[in-house]
Swiss-Prot record:
Organism from which the protein derives: Bacillus subtilis (strain 168)
Residues annotated as domain ABM: 14-104
Gene: yjcS
Annotated Pfam families: ABM
Molecular function per GO: catalytic activity
Protein name from the UniProt record: Uncharacterized protein YjcS
Length: 105
């Protein structure tokens, strides 16, 4: 895991956990291909510590996102990136619930 420092010397991280409900009729495997591409590109972003997308049971048609970012600004920038916009335009999912927390060490 990459380490990131705050000006004060401690580590600051922004955690996000989200449950996405699949609203598209597309096959789950096709949808997950899109999310794996998103995962690969997002993990290259400056400010992204880790980003993972995992499907729940196929019958549930839900995807979990686990994300750790340097700060909230990095998250905002993430939503301006082409790979993020491309997935959003497809209207594959909607947010069922989302939890955010900031941790400073």
């Amino acid at each position: 895991m990459k380490s990131h420092k705050m000006m004060g010397g401690g580590i600051s991280m922004h955690y996000i956990t989200a449950c996405l409900k699949i609203i598209s009729d597309k096959d789950l495997n096709e949808i997950m291909k899109e999310f794996k591409k998103l995962e690969e590109e997002t993990n290259k972003e400056e400010g992204c510590i880790t980003f993972h997308a995992y499907p729940l049971e196929p019958s549930e048609r839900k995807i979990m996102l686990w994300e750790i970012w340097e700060n909230e600004e990095a998250v905002k920038i993430h939503f301006t990136k082409k790979h993020t916009i491309d997935v959003q335009k497809q209207e594959l999912t909607e947010v069922e619930w989302l939890m955010k927390s900031n941790v400073n060490d």
